[in-house]
A protein has these predicted regions:
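Class I S-adenosyl-L-methionine-dependent methyltransferase catalytic core
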Residues: 1-180, 186-241
């Protein structure tokens, strides 16, 4: 197996293909590009897994969640415009397996497998379940984790997921070794990928979040343990969006 080939069979292009891209951070198999995903994505090759958490519903009128509550946050400069579905579809075309948190807000195909994060201690102002659209060929899965217990590190990004939740979601993709996140935020995907020893390319257009992500990645790798995670199988969700 060559250095660019992954166990899942996807092939990343040689590093020379990225010659015109200057990374903000590049160490230990994790790369951050500071810029617009619409310009950077066409320059990238294929990946085993797309794992991303778009800032859906941020800076807009609050939108109803599946549970009837509304998701709305203070408008941020990085989200002056709606996140274009073009970015998601371009990223999807570059990955064999795809996990998109908040995918129910976008025009995506029906999914057999929905990943969900149940938050038993969620405040009344926010929904107690968040969903991820996937193309995974397996039954839907749910993780039940307290917000306070799993997210002691709040880094200022409105849609930041707990590291443990993103780590669990990556595990659902099996042997994926190369990961793409075109809407990286504070870099939780890269942090989880580093802990697993996987290669990850992230894109983020706000430099302050690139700085936060780079600082997190410079810290010592902490082993991820799955034995404290409560998992449950739920019925097939082929009719869900």
């Amino acid at each position: 197996m060559t250095s660019n080939e992954t166990t899942a069979g996807a092939l990343l292009p040689p590093l020379s293909c990225y010659a015109s891209l200057v990374p903000y951070y590049d160490a230990g198999g994790i790369t951050i590009y500071h810029g617009d995903s619409r310009k950077i994505l066409p320059m990238l090759g294929r990946f085993d897994l797309l794992m991303t958490d778009p800032p859906y519903g941020i800076g807009f009128a609050a939108q109803p969640t599946t549970g009837g509550r509304k998701r709305g946050q203070k408008k941020e400069q990085w989200d002056d415009e709606a996140i274009e579905e073009w970015v998601l579809h371009q990223a999807m075309a570059r990955a064999d397996k795809r996990v998109i948190w908040g995918g129910n807000y976008y025009n995506l195909p029906a999914a057999r497998c929905i990943l969900s994060w149940y938050k038993p201690d969620a405040p009344p102002s926010m929904g107690n379940v968040e969903y991820a659209w996937t193309n995974l060929d397996q039954n839907s899965r749910q993780i039940s984790r307290s917000i306070a217990a799993t997210n002691p590190e709040r880094l200022g990004h409105p849609t930041q997921k707990p590291l443990h939740v993103i780590s669990w979601a990556i595990q659902q993709a099996g042997e994926a070794q190369t990961i793409l996140d075109p809407l990286a935020g504070s870099g939780t995907t890269g942090h989880a990928a580093k802990n697993f020893g996987k290669r990850c390319v992230m894109i983020e257009r706000e430099e302050r979040y690139c700085e936060i992500a780079a600082r997190r990645l410079a810290q010592e790798v902490l082993p991820f343990s799955s034995h404290n995670t409560k998992l449950s199988d739920s019925p097939s969700c082929s009719d869900q969006r």
